[in-house]
Amino acid sequence: MKLDGYTRLAAVVANPIKHSISPFIHNRAFEATATNGAYVAWEIEASDLAETVANIRRYQMFGINLSMPYKEQVIPYLDELSDEARLIGAVNTVVNENGNLIGYNTDGKGFFKCLPSFTISGKKMTLLGAGGAAKSILAQAILDGVSQISVFVRSVSMEKTRPYLDKLQEQTGFKVDLCALEYVSELQARIAESDLLVNATSVGMDGQSSPVPENIVLPETLLVADIIYQPFETPFLKWARSQGNPAVNGLGMLLYQAAEAFQLWTGKEMPTEEIWQSLTEKYQ
């Protein structure tokens, strides 16, 4: 990697973040595209967020990525928001356009790009969870023309989830069905008519638990996706594959949301196939 007086910085900002795979992805991309850039991880306190954003202008950076807990907190410090960032209410990418800081959310686009030979337009989706990743997938699905979305959360989370779905309906005219995860018969019925089933919860990161009961029967044509990428195969994905269904983990989402950010910063396409090979060799 070339480092000199002309090198431009990009960074991922979060807390914690030292475990991040993003520097590996972006620095490989800078090198592969002969871009004079370097990407680092900044673990900061909330009190340093305003100054960190100011440094994007000060040091003429490409921009930054954001992860928890700063995806929403960063918004007041930005000059503009993209349509999807406004709809989601969260930003994962800030682009420095000649000192004008624009917030984007590439998570949803990254998720749908990682699905093999699948487009969400006109399809039905069942989504487990309603956190930050789920919101980005929800909003992008609506923007891309999904025909039906069923969101399942634990009954204790229903009240907290409904206001966001109501806001989405106000802004887009699209009604999302909200259901309790404990109602297994309803979960089975929704999955049976779906084209895509997504686990957007953290259940399965322990390598042992699954967000759905194992007696759920999956339709043959259903594509199953999990946003988790460590472990590489969660119990949820293993269960789906045991029924003969195609199943995708979250590593592709991580790569393709990064590719969207990289293009916004540099105007260049990230060589995703080459980097995917490096990623799977390193993290599988």
Swiss-Prot record:
One of its GO terms (biological process) is amino acid biosynthetic process. Shikimate binds at residues 20-22, 67, 92, 107, 229. Signal peptide: none annotated. CDD domains: NAD_bind_Shikimate_DH (cd01065). The active site is at 71 (proton acceptor). NADP(+) binds at residues 83, 129-133, 227, 250. It catalyses: shikimate + NADP(+) = 3-dehydroshikimate + NADPH + H(+). One of its GO terms (molecular function) is shikimate 3-dehydrogenase (NADP+) activity. Involved in the biosynthesis of the chorismate, which leads to the biosynthesis of aromatic amino acids. Catalyzes the reversible NADPH linked reduction of 3-dehydroshikimate (DHSA) to yield shikimate (SA). This is Shikimate dehydrogenase (NADP(+)). It comes from Streptococcus pneumoniae (strain CGSP14).
